[in-house]
Swiss-Prot record:
One of its GO terms (biological process) is lipid transport. The keyword Transport applies. Residues 1-33 form the signal peptide. SMART domains: AAI. It comes from the Eukaryota. Keywords: Disulfide bond, Lipid-binding, Signal, Transport. This is Probable non-specific lipid-transfer protein AKCS9. It comes from Vigna unguiculata. Gene3D superfamilies: Plant lipid-transfer and hydrophobic proteins (1.10.110.10). Belongs to the plant LTP family. Expressed in most tissues except nodules.
Amino acid sequence: MTMKMKMKMSVVCAVVVVALFLIDVGPVAEAVTCNPTELSSCVPAITGGSKPSSTCCSKLKVQEPCLCNYIKNPSLKQYVNSPGAKKVLSNCGVTYPNC
């Protein structure tokens, strides 16, 4: 086998390996639209200390990637950092972000 042929085989093998990794990646994550009003169902639990509804928890889980943006927003920071919000996050099984 010539050197040129070995080089071509190496390139083909590398392409096949990369293709196998790409095939196994799975579905691409959908982008989340960050909209704090989606969390309005959580307000009674945050402000009143009641148990969060299943709607609240499901919305929190969808909006979880947005929490750091909410914390960085001066208008929303006080609500997301409140003890009530932290309790709701915990009750819903959503980890408080470390931004």
